Amino acid sequence: MGIIARQTIKGSFYSYLGVVLGGINVAILYPRILTEDQIGLINILIALSAIFAQFSSLGINGVTNYFFHYFRDLTRRHHGYLSIIAIVTGIGFAGFLLIYGLFSEQILSSRADNSTLLSDYNIYVIPVTFFTLAFIVLDVYAAVQGKSVIGTFMKDFVFRIANMVLILCLYFDLIGFADFIFLYTLALALPPVVILAELGRKGHLTLKAPDADILKKHGKKMKSVGGYHILAGFGNMLVTYIDRYMINFFLGLGATGIYSVTNYVGTLVQIPRRSMGKIATPMLARLWAENKREELQNIYERSSISQLLLGVYIFIGIWINIDAVFKIIPRDYESGKWVIFYIGLANLFQCFLGLGGLLITTSRYYKMRTWFTFMLGFLVVLTNIIFIPILGIAGAAMASAFSKLIFVVFNMWFLHFKLGIVPLLREHVIIPLTGALSYGLVLFIPLPAMHWVIELVLNSILITIFYGILLRTFRVVPNVKQFFRSF
């Protein structure tokens, strides 16, 4: 089993643990302990900070993935590459402080909300942005050192444990909501601090003047890559977080809270994608440099098949149990039912692409991926403006699904006609049809009235059996087994 598979499995293990913890926090504890407005506030802080942190990074993560192998030399302190990261992010964060200082009132405005929560806690956007920026930059730097799992472990597992402890402290009146927000912000510092410590322990945390010869040779292209990754990263953050911001603008914090809780359930479909890309990026860049196209095609096929297989399984598993989901989440949040469906569908569309997006990003056509992503961000904003006033929070989710479908189609077209990668496979048709057929078979089996927990377990067992049998019947499973053996 290769490095991608090992790191992906380790990362996925912590991701799944994080999903369990996140599900307990978001679906069970948050709705029962916090008000909808308070949940909305937390998610607005996260959304704004993620967007600002991505902008403040000034594209350095793209530069790290694309160029670090030219600097890699531990005996020479990686030719001062960490100093480049520090300088670039320092300039970016200073720019954020200036923009937020001048326009914070306009940024936090809402047409529908008279709540004072945002104005009371707007100062927290600054430290949350700083800790988020530190994490996303150090996480990528650690990944190119072969330490991709530590970030996943800290962010998806340790931070969520800390979050659970804090929300329980709030429940038992050991702290107030103001204390919760303060300690929540401090907890966000844990992942970057631990990554820093691990990098220091391994000798990767050293500062020196960047190597002038390497910069002279690659500096111009590094600036170009960084510039395009600013647009790409900003587009990605718009796609991921702008819906919460726009729901707050049109509908208020309460609607943002409901959307955020149900959105989390829909994002479970993307779990198979999360850990794979981080460790694969530097490897794909190397394969392009060596022009190993056959190996790149094989990586695309295995990543796409495995992600789609697991993504479809999670999607149909959620939707067959949707009534049980709203036994876990309070019924007050049932207006977000179709948010779960459309967000799940949006993430399922991206599973079709596998590592195809990263194949474009790490190729000489990286600029096109940037324009595709920026186009996606623009399309998400436009469709949110159209759909939210008409359909409410379900409109925001529908906007994401529609936009990501267009995005995936454009990426597949480019993979085929520009990179010579065959994007559509037999499995891309069989796996979704197998999932739909499995769902239909379970749906039309008459079941007697029973407790919702028993029904959830029974539905899950049935969907697993039918899905597994049909996958084996259509000979999809052997391909996935090969993926885990050889990737």
Predicted regions mapped to residue ranges:
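Interhelical loop/hinge segments that connect adjacent transmembrane helices in multipass membrane
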Residues: 1-4, 116-117, 177-183, 195-240, ...
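Signature of the first transmembrane helix
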Residues: 2-65, 93-101, 128, 224-254
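Membrane-interface junctions at transmembrane-helix termini in multi-pass inner-membrane proteins
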Residues: 5, 67, 131-154, 344-376, ...
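Transmembrane helical elements of multi-pass membrane transporters/channels
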Residues: 7-23, 183-199, 215-286, 306, ...
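Helix-loop junctions and terminal segments of transmembrane helices
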Residues: 57-73, 144, 262-304, 308-311, ...
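Interfacial segments at transmembrane-helix termini and the short loops linking adjacent helices
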Residues: 104-125, 309, 318-348, 354
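Hydrophobic alpha-helical transmembrane segments
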Residues: 153-169, 173-203, 374-379, 393-414, ...
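Membrane-proximal transmembrane or re-entrant/amphipathic helices at the cytosolic face
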Residues: 444-487
